[in-house]
Swiss-Prot record:
Name the UniProt record assigns to this protein: Prophenin-2
Residue numbers spanned by region 7 X 10 AA tandem repeats: 148-217
Any one GO cellular component localisation term in the record: extracellular space
GO annotation (BP), single: innate immune response
Signal sequence region: 1-29
Stated role: Exerts antimicrobial activity. It is more effective against Gram-negative bacteria than Gram-positive bacteria.
GO molecular function: lipopolysaccharide binding
Sequence repeat residue numbers: 148-157, 158-167, 168-177, 178-187, 188-197, 198-207, 208-217
Cystine pairings recorded for this chain: 85-96, 107-124
Amino acid sequence: METQRASLCLGRWSLWLLLLALVVPSASAQALSYREAVLRAVDRLNEQSSEANLYRLLELDQPPKADEDPGTPKPVSFTVKETVCPRPTRRPPELCDFKENGRVKQCVGTVTLDQIKDPLDITCNEGVRRFPWWWPFLRRPRLRRQAFPPPNVPGPRFPPPNVPGPRFPPPNFPGPRFPPPNFPGPRFPPPNFPGPPFPPPIFPGPWFPPPPPFRPPPFGPPRFPGRR
């Protein structure tokens, strides 16, 4: 009787150990690595995206401290870049080449390492400066600088320069000497034009009236004193 009970207990313990051995590998198989969880989040982002091309993981920040619970949300920060593969092709992004001058997005959020839970709690922005997940813990408070009034110091006053200007002697250059012109004057032949055939002028002389006859004045003979 005791032998049957012992065998029954041993069978129960064997069954429990067998079930435990089956459950532990299945649980470990459901857990993802940090990079696999991020890649799954990138796939979900491509599924929900309305853009023409797929995005591929470009850079992944350092993972946080390891946590035994795969269902605990873990902070994540990574960068994705646009590829040359169109989104309707459903091609794995890891097999696509990056597009030259493609768009780059910075993504932050949380992911879980459990395959069953939905890991998508990611926000992506374009043109945002990238910071690691531990950056808020290392930030130091900025010290405000004390505002001082601007200095009210008058500037230096310099007297105007009293430097005499240069004195140059007057130019003593002789003027140019040109020889007198020795050009022969023009030689014209004497004019040989016939004069106009005018008749000699006949002008009447001036007409004066004849003088009146001379009449002596009516005086007597002259008388001289001293003579009788």
